[in-house]
Amino acid sequence: MVRPGLAAALASGSVTSARVISVNVGRGRDADWAGKLGRTAIDKRPVAGRVEVGRLGLGGDEQVDKPAHGGPEQAVYAYAREDLDWWVEQLGRDLANGLFGENITTAGVDVTGALIGETWQVGTATVQVTGPRIPCVVFAGWMDERQWVRQFADARRPGAYLRVLREGMVAAGDPVEVVSRPDERVTIAESMTAYYGDAELMSRLLRVEGRGLAWDEIAPAVLQRAAAGS
């Protein structure tokens, strides 16, 4: 069965190459399930035409909880249509492009296997992979799935946050090209494992050039817990 999110890409024959199939933006709104802030912009919807990719995110997009899901280190969030389709099978429900709050939905891109610190050319912008999406109570409230935080974390299909190295424009149909990869190889999936307590992976991650700066703040607690438990 052809998934709804892939229909347009299949029609154009574009799923065989790495590309953007949807650009998604959203504005903040109040919600009683939106954690302590009571407000969220997780509801991202596909937009037509070319969209500006700036240092702090996409034109027309809002980030409500910037410390957790915004700023220059997390300016853009990318998620693979293939991973969304995996979740379709797990959850038994349709998942539209943008439903996970991603700004860019890709096809033909191994986002889960992307390396921390690798750079992509997306449209006319250059971006760098900085880290995984860590699920939170707002995401759980939005999805309305039991035990969603744990389920999403355990799946190790978190999508990738991106730092914008060169501003530009992006639209559905634009190719995604890997420009460079760091010598130290830690994938998005492995970085999530590091976040949840793997000291060996965390030590490797700290050697990655271009990693998100937040790792330097997260690492001490992970390494200390590992040392205390050894």
Located regions from the model:
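Electropositive, beta-rich accessory/interaction domains or terminal extensions
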Residues: 1-141, 147, 180-230
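Short alpha-helix capping/helix-loop boundary micro-motifs
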Residues: 106, 159-166
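Loop/turn positions that initiate beta-strands
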Residues: 117, 167, 172-173
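Short Gly/Pro-enriched turn/cap motifs at secondary-structure boundaries
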Residues: 151-152
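Short, well-ordered coil↔helix boundary/capping segments
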Residues: 155, 164-167, 185
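A structural signal for small-residue-enriched, beta-sheet-centric alpha/beta enzyme cores
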Residues: 157-158, 176
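Basic (Lys/Arg-enriched) interaction patch that binds polyanionic ligands
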Residues: 172-181
